[in-house]
């Protein structure tokens, strides 16, 4: 009986060790810099600077072969845009005195394939890339003129962008990132590029002047993380 229990304990330890080598959990957080721009029929609206957001995530790396791994998880991301557009009647116009700001909070699932290289016993470098899938938990738009105190606010998923067509809650895109590990702590830098127009879902019922309104998420981020 003692030999049997000893054998089972040894097997469990070996299994746990193998699982730990194949499956790693990590958490990371940091700022997101959105350089997305509203476009109208392919023409970019005058930017008002980079919008700063955040990302916080919990991820899992699964070892495939030596150095090669797959990674996925969940992250909360704040993205959006800042520009000088405003709606004059049914026409989208640009004025340096106007400020239009869109803020969208996403729950995002990345699916990456990466390669991790050990430089020393405690220093590792990794590169990864792959698609992401995101759903918006909420979004707002504030638009107005700097010369007045009148600011209009919209829930873009209930009232729409500029109070017109409802925004698209879903986004799909492609991302890439690099990570430098110092023991269990790592720093990361990466970028995500959205494929979908998140500004509107069905432009058929709105004014011809802004049927071509488009917003695709484009972000760069940095962060610090901890690998368990």
Give short role names for the model-derived ranges:
Residues 1-28, 224-228:
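Bacterial Sec-dependent N-terminal signal peptides
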Residues 20, 65, 118-122, 182-185:
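Outer-membrane beta-barrel channels and translocator barrels
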Residues 23, 54, 68, 107, ...:
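Hydrophobic core residues within well-ordered beta-strands of beta-rich domains
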Residues 27-33, 54-64, 74-76, 109-115, ...:
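Residues on the lipid-exposed face of transmembrane beta-strands in outer-membrane beta-barrel proteins
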Residues 35-51, 78-107, 134-173, 195-221:
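Extracellular/periplasm-exposed beta-strand and loop segments of Gram-negative cell-envelope proteins
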Residues 72-73, 80:
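A glycine-rich, hydrophobic loop/mini-helix early in the fold
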Residues 100-118, 122-138:
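Structural signature of Gram-negative outer-membrane beta-barrels, strongest in the C-terminal barrel
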